[in-house]
Curated annotation (Swiss-Prot):
Span list, region Thioredoxin fold: 81-230
Organism: Saccharomyces cerevisiae (strain ATCC 204508 / S288c) (Baker's yeast)
Protein's name in the database: Phosducin-like protein 1
Residue ranges occupied by any Phosducin domain in the UniProt entry: 16-166
InterPro entries for the chain: Phosducin_thioredoxin-like_dom (IPR024253), Thioredoxin-like_sf (IPR036249)
Localisation: Cytoplasm
This protein's encoding gene: PLP1
Record text on subunit structure and interactions: Interacts with the G protein beta-gamma subunit complex (STE4-STE18 complex).
Taxonomic placement: Eukaryota, Fungi, Dikarya, Ascomycota, Saccharomycotina
Gene Ontology MF terms: G-protein beta/gamma-subunit complex binding
Residues forming coiled coils: 25-79
Keywords: Acetylation, Chaperone, Coiled coil, Cytoplasm, Pheromone response, Signal transduction inhibitor
UniProt GO cellular component terms: cytoplasm
Length: 230
């Protein structure tokens, strides 16, 4: 199932990029709808063969998959999803963080090596989690947020859900013992536990990550979630 969904995500992103440079006619749109229907039919057959799924539960899950994929397609077509987007000014960054359901924002300096490293990881996740916006903003362009969030160490990453801060990363300290890097799976799992990225169908599970540790860390923060208080 994971491979099928990943192929669909890749196809949607690829088609969206082509659409920016060409006029989309009705036949192309119909083809996209047929591809979605074909994928859903394949998943239906696959789930039907999986004895772990009870029939009623299988139908519910299939509907969830359908809704999720349609939302993914809409997000990509509306732009802003599927990539790490550079935001040029503070006002736009604030609006995105307060108005978007799920967003991960990286406060960075492009000349700082660790920020470049973080950008690579976030770019990777942005292509896989198409219901979350991933953005980056230069700290020199957002003095209000730098002061508000008390940003003193870079990279500085914050995850918001419905305008509420769910998780933050100051440097790499929460992502392992290596001060110069981290396993992307740690960041992925931590964001998932915080509710900032969603893997609705639990198709990506990494047993190498200590999930209880992340759950405990994010539970502590959830008790004191804060918004931007603009």
């Amino acid at each position: 199932m994971e491979d099928k969904l990943d192929r669909y995500y890749t196809n949607v992103l690829s088609n969206a990029e082509k659409d920016k440079h060409t006029t989309v006619d009705s036949d192309d749109k119909s083809s996209g709808e047929e591809n979605l229907d074909e994928l859903l039919n394949e998943l239906d057959r696959e789930l039907d063969e999986d004895h772990e799924f009870l029939s009623a539960y299988r139908s519910e899950r299939l509907q969830q998959i359908s809704d999720h994929l349609k939302q993914v397609k809409k997000n990509v077509e509306d732009d802003g999803y599927g990539r790490l987007q550079c935001i040029d000014n503070e006002a736009d960054a604030i609006q995105i963080c307060t108005k978007t359901t799920m967003v991960v924002i990286h406060f960075e300096l492009e000349t700082f090596g660790k920020c470049q490293y973080m950008n690579e990881k976030l770019e990777n996740l942005a292509k896989r989690y198409l219901t979350t916006r991933f953005i980056k903003v230069n700290v020199q362009t957002c003095p209000f947020l730098v002061n508000k969030l008390n940003i003193k160490v870079l990279p500085f990453v914050v995850g918001y859900k419905n305008g509420l801060e769910k998780v933050r990363y100051v440097g790499f300290s929460k992502l392992g013992n290596d001060p110069n890097g981290f396993d992307i799976r740690r960041l992925e799992q931590s964001l998932a536990h915080s509710g900032v990225i969603e893997d609705t169908f639990e198709i990506r599970k990494h047993s190498s990550v200590n999930t209880e540790r992340f759950a405990s860390t994010n539970h502590d923060r959830s008790e004191s979630d804060s918004d931007l208080d603009i």
